Amino acid sequence: MLDAHTVQVGEKKVSGKYLAIAVGGKSWVPDKPGKELALTSDDLFHLKQLPKSVTLMGSGYIGLEFAGIFAGLGSEVTVMFRSDLPLPEMDGDVRKVLKEQMESRGIRFVTGASLEKLTQTGDQIEVHTDQGSWKSEIFVAATGRVPNTEGLGLQEVGVNLGEKGEVLTDEHCRTSVESIFAVGDCVGGVQLTPYAIAQGRALAARLFQDPNADFRPHHVPTAVFTQPAVGTVGLTQEQAEESNPGDIDVYRTSFRPMKYTLPDKPEKVMMKLVVRRSNQLVLGCHMVGSDAPEIIQALAVALTCGASKQDFDRTLAVHPTAAEEFVLLRDPVKS
């Protein structure tokens, strides 16, 4: 970046009234002894053969999705992280149910664990943590991504960066330079594709169409393509209770879908609605189970349009489906 209105790409200079930084993030490995033995999620696409055993470090969607992939292909999978449950930004019930379901598929979780070092033992990597040691054929650092802002000359033109290199912005995605904005993974926070898309759309609308357009993170549907999958839109129960103390009803159900009864599979589905009691506005929809991303995509329309619990109750159910449970929830489990 040459100045507040100009960037250089190779030998070409491009100028504009506004500049938007959307350079994403990159994988990183924690600075621990033996870190050169660790792979990142980028490296996994270049494996020449399926490892017999895999340890993944990280509680986020990348590590959990790859855990499901490797377990499904027959690898022995261990997932380690420092917290008690995965997906720290998700609803508490989602986190708990997903961990239980993944464990039922044979995935081992080591929680409350911090990595101390990695060592090579023959053709195995020994993982040393404060919770003990074990061996795996490969070790994957899936500890998130860091902003890909190094070497862009951002600070030289006055753009303020955070400790991890993230671009510091206000609620309108504006940086410390009036004509420069930033969206997506490079600003830190939630690193999911729908969030970056929503930020970009809101920014474009505000600059060129509607000056009052804003980014509404709670209307952004997201999915985690684990086994089973997660779909969510709106506020978590924890967020809703914090912003609406004493005014939240929670509707929740857990069941085994009909398609799993004949093959006698143990997999269950969890569905949850978070509702503001005073006006019956649905604040959040959450699901763990088969087809969760597909179902949540449709429910995101309802939340964006301001659907109430009465709207859900009036909606006829398509039977027999799993999705019908969202419109058949009648009694709150928490008031």
Give each language-model segment a name.
Residues 21-82, 109, 155-157, 161-172, ...:
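Glycine-rich dinucleotide-binding loop and its adjacent helix/turn
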Residues 13-24, 55-57, 77, 134-144, ...:
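Short hydrophobic core segments
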Residues 225-236, 241-335:
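Flexible, glycine-rich terminal cap/loop adjacent to redox cofactors
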Residues 1-18, 109, 116-126:
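Feature captures the FAD/FMN-dependent oxidoreductase FAD-binding
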Residues 26-28, 160-162, 210-219, 244-251:
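A short alpha-helix-loop-beta-strand transition element characteristic
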Residues 3-4, 23, 40-42, 111-113, ...:
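Short loop/edge segments at beta-strand edges and connector loops
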Residues 45-46, 51-55, 61-126, 130, ...:
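Rossmann-like dinucleotide-binding cores of NAD(P)H-dependent redox enzymes
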Residues 36-51, 134-209:
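FAD-site-proximal beta/loop scaffold in flavoenzymes
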